[in-house]
Amino acid sequence: MTAPNETTIRFLLDGETVEVDGLPATTTVLEWLREHAGRTGTKEGCAEGDCGACTVVLGEPHDDGGVRYRAVNSCIRFLPTIDGKELVTVESLQAPDGALHPVQQAMVDCHGSQCGFCTPGFVMSLLALYLDEPAPTRERVLEALAGNLCRCTGYRPIVEAARCAGVYPEPARWSRAGAADAARRRALDALARDADLRLPDFHAPRSLSALADAVAARPDALLLAGATDIGLWVTKDLCELPPLIYLGEVPELQRITADAGGLHIGAAVPLSSAWPAIVAQRPALAEVAQRFASPPVCNSGTLVGNIANGSPIGDSMPALIACGATITLRRGEHQRALALEDFYLGYRRKDLAPGELVEAVHVPAPVEGERTACYKLAKRFDQDISAVCLGMRIVLDGEHIADARLAFGGMAAIPARARHAEAALRGQPLRDAVVETAAAALAEDFTPIGDMRAGEGYRLRAAGNLLRRFLHEQTGGTVRLAEVTV
């Protein structure tokens, strides 16, 4: 096999090496499949990573020596980012004799398809689950399908199909044993490149120093990780993007390190790896981790990408700010640390110099007496944008609150701390009167706006109710909520 050309995208598809030249860097995987490869089984529904009709599976080398297969949204995934990986589509599953894969046959037998438009996406999400877990629980199935929408079946037969797919005979293609075959890893290793992938308006450095040099040399470039937000600028806003510098090939940014001081999460670590590490440290954050986004989005998007995006309704920032997270910024060889809440200067404005990048986020370890939670209010449980999000951390010394940190999303132009409410809690006992004083102080911290997700009055009163919920949960008491209207 010839060495990879630094201007040619190479990946595996059905055991064959595919080489792609001459396409724009913002060509999506879905666009390539349907318009260039003739693989029309993968559908476009929403073009923003919400509906799951476009789901495919990507395989990439794993530290255990094998290949890890994960579902991703092809509608917002740029083609150069699958260089060196294995692409699996719904057409890949059928056996040479025409027999269906177990996840497909289970969908047929359980009557899991009606109009059929969403079915290929469900099948691919189920394939990723099938390869990962032979006997998934119902809860695990629901998590795996959180990014797939169907408007026909009501989901019950699809969930049944997922539960029973594992009892079918092993398929000729894409069995668990076949996916774990060492030959697949060898085929991916053969695609590994020493030189950076360089396309017009796309550069994928392969070391942290090379990345820092590239960003410093092109401060006008746009840094790209998972494209779960940037992808929409192309598919929905039809934007012409500036040159892209891709973080996903930098080994130093793909690591999570843990020590007595906490977690250090690199800028290219996907959300599907970052959140479990955080939840292992703070189990109370499990719900917001589950609700953050669907598996396909979390398998592409990164925690640092969510931080760097700086949206006032980004769900990671309230929890991280409450935990006292800091970020590491780099320009060339120079690094500096910054408290996460100080990173945001105003709407879409950040303390980020030209040519500087966010290298990592550090989440401090819990301390004795710490209680933490994060609550998200949205119109849907899965795959929805917050109206209000509260991240809260208190440290108890006996019955008194020695320290308190409250951070909100959806209440201001930036993710922000509620410093007046914090002051009302510090040094006080866990009592109803203290809770009410802190809830009232939120009006001094925020003047929220009204929009399509919630009115200003709703946001302020709902924020107070989330504060009441947290503090009453710590005492085991009854939550007395203020009445709110949207």
Model-derived regions: residue spans:
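A basic, amphipathic helix-loop patch mediating RNA/tRNA/ribosome contacts
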Residues: P24-V56
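S4-like RNA-binding module at protein N-termini
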Residues: L58-T89
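Extended heptad-repeat alpha-helical coiled-coils characteristic
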Residues: S92-A95
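Short structural boundary motif marking the start of a folded domain
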Residues: N5-F11
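Short Cys/His-rich Zn2+-coordinating modules
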Residues: L33-R39, A99-L100, D132-A135
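Short, contiguous acidic and Ser/Thr-rich linear segments
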Residues: E16-A25
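C-terminal structural segment of proteins
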Residues: L12, T17, V57-P61, R70-S74, ...
